[in-house]
Amino acid sequence: LGKLKSEILMALFAGTFENRIDRKGRVSLPADFRAELPADGPRVVYIYPSPRGTALEACGRDFMQRMSDSIEQFDIFSDEEDEMTASIVAAARRITIDTEGRIVLPPELITDAEIVDAVTFVGRGGRFQIWNPSDYFNYAAEARERSKGRTMRLLPLEGRDE
């Protein structure tokens, strides 16, 4: 792990896309998202139920490793470590992206996210979410309303005072 933060190039998932699921449970991962995954090595994503609602969370291997490492910062055998491991690491499914850019959503994850015949992919920076489209539409409208008037501060670029 001896890389500096600035040397690690993480995926940046951005945008919102809706795709239909076929009879076999396959759905095309948006091309913009596929482009963010490493070109060398296995083309996989890790998908698990969101701890914050009915969406699914998804990420590449690097982000999943960061989450696992972060969970290991809790005291071993603590309630926090146990709960986070059970709800994220143990619940995650390693999903291979086929040659046509599709993933197969396991039935239990489809049920968890209340998905029927289409999904909305939502970029979240280093990870993305998979939603039932109507649930995401409602969530996004509420989030936009709550965020009105809020501001944020950008992190400074490394090595520069801003």
Annotate each language-model stretch with its function.
Residues 1-18, 23-26, 33-95, 99-100, ...:
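Flexible "stalk/tail and boundary" regions
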